[in-house]
Amino acid sequence: ETDSAKLSQLILQAAEDEIMFEGPNTIAAFIMEPVLGAGGIMVPHETFMPGMQQLCSKHGILMIADEVITGFGRTGDWSGSRHWGVQPDFMCTAKAITNGYYPFGACMIAEHVAEVFERAGADGFVGHGYTYTAHPVGAAAAIACLKETERLDVKTNAAARGTQMFEGAKRLMEKHSAIGDVRGGHGLMTGIEFVKDRATKAPMDPSFGLSVQKVAMDNGVMLRASGTN
């Protein structure tokens, strides 16, 4: 299926079929990236994440958003979930929460989930902490970084620069037959797929992407090669 809206509905139906086959009571949670990063920037249709949230709510399944890449402005919104109009039950974050100034990650939990543990008394205790949990330096770095991210209005700039980058990548596709697809357009998330032949979508050797990465780096542009992307 090449129509993204129809594909979204087909996947949602397949997901519900699988849920009913396995039994909703056997599924604790569903995890997804709002925009798939490492796979070469795979952007779902705008109906997919809201549809999955409705599906999870219908069957009593928690939704966990992996916002390690998409969080804190990258998509042109404060989170990738918010970009699609979704409030997940959990949001796992890292990277932009401290922008690499200090190693730090955080799992954000919706109030209705937290209340389950808080009201359970001693039975609600989950002993999953470890030595470095809630490190004060990491927490301070995260707060300072997020304040600066907000002050600079990073999300608005990411949206504008992202549009500029996406349109530029599409113009490159018009000039170079080795570019088989350009994906993205949601903030600073754009992927370029390299192919030997556009008609057959025969993939370029992964070494080609690494060569492009090196040339880009030599010219002051940071990008990441991922397979044929």
Which residues does each predicted region cover?
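Conserved N-terminal phosphate-binding loop of PLP-dependent enzymes in the Aspartate aminotransferase
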Residues: E1-N229
